[in-house]
Amino acid sequence: MKLKAIILAAGTGTRMKSKMPKVLHKVCGQTMLGHVIDVSKDSKAEECIVVVGHGAEEVQKTLPEGVKTVLQAEQLGTGHAVMVAEEHIETQGTVLVLYGDGPLITEETLNALMTYHQEGKYSATVLTAELENPTGYGRIIRDDDDRLKTIVEEKDTTVGEKEVREINSGIYCFDSKVLKETLPKIQNNNSQKEYYLTDALTIIKQEGLKVGVYQIENYEDIMAVNSREQLAEVEEVMQRRIVKKHMEAGVTFIDPQSTYIEKTVKVGMDTILHPGVILKGATEIGEDCIIGHNSRIENSILKNGIEVQSSTIIESTIDDHATIGPYAYLRPQSHIGKHVKVGDFVEVKNATIDDHSKAAHLAYIGDAEIGKHVNIGCGVIFVNYDGIKKHKTIIKDHAFVGSNSNLVAPITIQESAFVASGSTITREVPAGALAVGRSRQENKEGWVARKGVGKK
């Protein structure tokens, strides 16, 4: 079966009150349209055609390679949207029609819809669900034999039809040839003067062909987004699904409702996520890690047995059994080795810290290469910027940098060298040497009495 997906994404999204095209609003880190494209591909669609309109250029910039677009210059209804994609509809195979603002649709639901469509030998099949409050949706009107009679748009419903709870999801499965032949027959004889895709089903029925209705129990799959409130509702549902998937794979969430984790994140078995954790982008966390409360990790790789306490980690790599935080900040291109400690209020940027080294507290480590078993004392500053460009600091294995020292780059501290506390180091420190870069202490006896300070 040759399958194509047509995704309608031309709407203005007026109720979103946004300068951004509606389908580009994100749910769990990915655009709504991106979610729908992914599910289409997972359902084995050989080709995805996105119908763009409002903000067409912005939408096109976000699309993955291979996804085609057609322009609906005027938004004249769902039928018209599919009409502008007619050149991509062939005379054999199957066409799925989806919406770019419905990010919760699943591969399982689409596969079930297509199986029902194929096994029933239907020319068209509509996906439906029953809602407690169907306001805003088109209604499924059935005949006395419980088969589809017609679909009535919300704005065209009678008082009696408004009471119907079975709604049209807007998702359809068509025989390609039948759809191609039916599109030119759709008229705009309605109060809105729009071309409704629902009319295609009526035409297909009138021509004696079979139209199926596939009703799902989980209405969440077909939730659409037309407002910020609905965006939040959809985000909540997707978060719940993501968390459930991770828990089933052996991840512990101390408080699932307060944890934010994007769809693209990977987490290993027996890792524990505490309340307030935020995991984003291409983050990968290994097994047996503990991610403490209010930690934020983006596009980073954490290996096994790592503990992170209330820290921020951006585009960095952390090797096995390192400890980070509390309140550490790892900025992009940081690589933390095995059994390394990066303690409280330590900031690391574009730096490598090799195995068993530690910076326990209150340090800035920028543009640096630090060897094994190195100690960085409290208050150490890597002075990496001269006002024009950044410079690198290299510290070799087993070196020791005392508290409150400034290392003015470019500089190298050789193996097993020591830097005395309070020093400002401006040139290389040889292996095994002690570097002292501070003025000698001078005590002025009797100074307090002479100045008359201290006592009142």
From Swiss-Prot:
The active site is at H361 (proton acceptor). Residues 250-456 are annotated as: N-acetyltransferase. Its main location: cytoplasm. This is Bifunctional protein GlmU. Its EC number is 2.7.7.23, 2.3.1.157. Keywords: Acyltransferase, Cell shape, Cell wall biogenesis/degradation, Cytoplasm, Magnesium, Metal-binding, Multifunctional enzyme, Nucleotidyltransferase, Peptidoglycan synthesis, Repeat, Transferase. Its cofactor is Mg(2+). Homotrimer. Pathway: Nucleotide-sugar biosynthesis; UDP-N-acetyl-alpha-D-glucosamine biosynthesis; N-acetyl-alpha-D-glucosamine 1-phosphate from alpha-D-glucosamine 6-phosphate (route II): step 2/2; Nucleotide-sugar biosynthesis; UDP-N-acetyl-alpha-D-glucosamine biosynthesis; UDP-N-acetyl-alpha-D-glucosamine from N-acetyl-alpha-D-glucosamine 1-phosphate: step 1/1; Bacterial outer membrane biogenesis; LPS lipid A biosynthesis. In the N-terminal section; belongs to the N-acetylglucosamine-1-phosphate uridyltransferase family. Residues 1-228 are annotated as: Pyrophosphorylase. PANTHER family: BIFUNCTIONAL PROTEIN GLMU (PTHR43584:SF3), NUCLEOTIDYL TRANSFERASE (PTHR43584). SUPFAM superfamilies: Nucleotide-diphospho-sugar transferases, Trimeric LpxA-like enzymes. NCBIfam families: glmU, PRK14354.1. GO terms for cellular component: cytoplasm; membrane. It comes from the Bacteria. Catalyzes the last two sequential reactions in the de novo biosynthetic pathway for UDP-N-acetylglucosamine (UDP-GlcNAc). The C-terminal domain catalyzes the transfer of acetyl group from acetyl coenzyme A to glucosamine-1-phosphate (GlcN-1-P) to produce N-acetylglucosamine-1-phosphate (GlcNAc-1-P), which is converted into UDP-GlcNAc by the transfer of uridine 5-monophosphate (from uridine 5-triphosphate), a reaction catalyzed by the N-terminal domain. Binds 1 Mg(2+) ion per subunit. Mg(2+) binds at D101, N226. GO terms for biological process: cell morphogenesis; cell wall organization; lipid A biosynthetic process; peptidoglycan biosynthetic process; regulation of cell shape; UDP-N-acetylglucosamine biosynthetic process. Acetyl-CoA binds at N384, Y385, S403, S421, R438. UDP-N-acetyl-alpha-D-glucosamine binds at residues 8-11, 22, 72, 77-78, 99-101, 138, 153, 168, 226, 331, 349, 364, 375. It is found in: Cytoplasm. It catalyses: alpha-D-glucosamine 1-phosphate + acetyl-CoA = N-acetyl-alpha-D-glucosamine 1-phosphate + CoA + H(+); N-acetyl-alpha-D-glucosamine 1-phosphate + UTP + H(+) = UDP-N-acetyl-alpha-D-glucosamine + diphosphate. One of its GO terms (molecular function) is UDP-N-acetylglucosamine diphosphorylase activity. Gene3D superfamilies: Hexapeptide repeat proteins (2.160.10.10), Spore Coat Polysaccharide Biosynthesis Protein SpsA, Chain A (3.90.550.10).
